[in-house]
Amino acid sequence: MEFMIEDLMEQLIDMGGSDLHLSAGLPPYFRISGHLTPIGDHILTADQCQRLIFSMLNNTQRKTLEQTWELDCSYGVKGLARFRVNVYKERGAYAACLRALSSKIPNFEKLGLPDIVREMSEKPRGLILVTGPTGSGKTTTLAAMIDLINRTRAEHILTVEDPVEFVYEPIKSLVHQRQLGEDTKSFANALKAALREDPDIILVGEMRDLETIALAISAAETGHLVFGTLHTSSASQTVDRIIDVFPSERQTQVRVQLSNSLVAVFSQTLVPKKNPKPGEYGRVMAQEIMIITPAISNLIREGKTAQIYSAIQTGGKLGMQTLEKVLADMYKAGTISFESAMSKTSKPDEVQRLIGATAPPAGVKR
């Protein structure tokens, strides 16, 4: 049996899947609503895997892959979708993971984003971070925010991504999108150049290293609105991660810079729905939201990040919310199960406290 890569992609989209995995010695796998599922029982050979993977690559990409054994790129099927592609080697054969990217940028209502996220998109300057594990919808949240700016403001938007996922057609804004490996050698190089390209809005697809983080903070300090992502699971952890990247002799200065430039942190995760309706997306987003107030700015400046959680707890009137509060509310509304709520928190006792008497007895699933 011979597979065509575009047939597998179409089947993935038809089934509402998010990821396609190709590996020698296994059938293709789809991730649907967070769960991996083998597709059929035909085992892919190493040659079949390589043929499927190489059919998505141009000559330059093939040469890069043969030299480095790893590759990030994107691939589009007209009329279907675009895909983020990562190719790697395992047990001597090529394997790949393809993430389906919607060609339509979802709006705030469809994503279920709180109004405060929209409000933060309207800020003229500062640093806004969307954080969470891989596959938590960070890029989608950022896309909704950038799309709102594009539709409502005459700005120059510059993005640096690896790879470009959502394509923005200029509406009110001028939009330039740069892809790592095709348009720039590194995030840091692109950010250095960006400051000479008259941007109003800068999106950094991933703040991976000290130089990129330092440049993003500096750009926010100098009057730009900067969006970025980190693989952190909470607002306080995000602050610590940024500070810890720098050597100890620079950390005091960076705390001051961050306290002055940071606007908001949205730390998010996707939680399986309890009873999704037919055709409905099987996961729901849960966000911890930290808005920088003078009090939180002082906590960052003074290195008292352990107190940030309490500040978020008391900041509900400003639009702030802890992840635990959101999970508890979703459980009480019947949107998610108790097990799902507990699996997404590092503070299970807090979730249990917020759920209160509605929590199931020990050993009982709900």
Predicted regions and their residues:
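Short, flexible helix-loop junctions that flank or precede catalytic/ligand sites
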Residues: 1-366
